[in-house]
Amino acid sequence: MAMETERKISIAKAIIEKAIEVSDKTKHDVFVDWAPHVQWVEVAIYLGGWKTGKNEYEKFTISFNRNTENVFKACMARLNELLTEAGNDFCD
């Protein structure tokens, strides 16, 4: 069964908002890409920031056709973890 448009938008908004927050409040860069032809949102997390030629990153592919909720929750948990770690850096 196809996911409803409203739910897709809700998931995409949540990811983009969190990606902006992580990119603004930490040393990490988070890229978000929507691929309509395959119905997924791809999230790439460059720990320590993006640099030319840097190929090491964490990737989450949230497919709206399968395993959406599990991957979405894992992605959001990782982004929240990075924010929490950044907050703890200020306490040192």
Where are each of the predicted segments found?
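Negatively charged, low-complexity tracts enriched in Asp/Glu with abundant Ser/Thr
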Residues: 1-42, 49-92
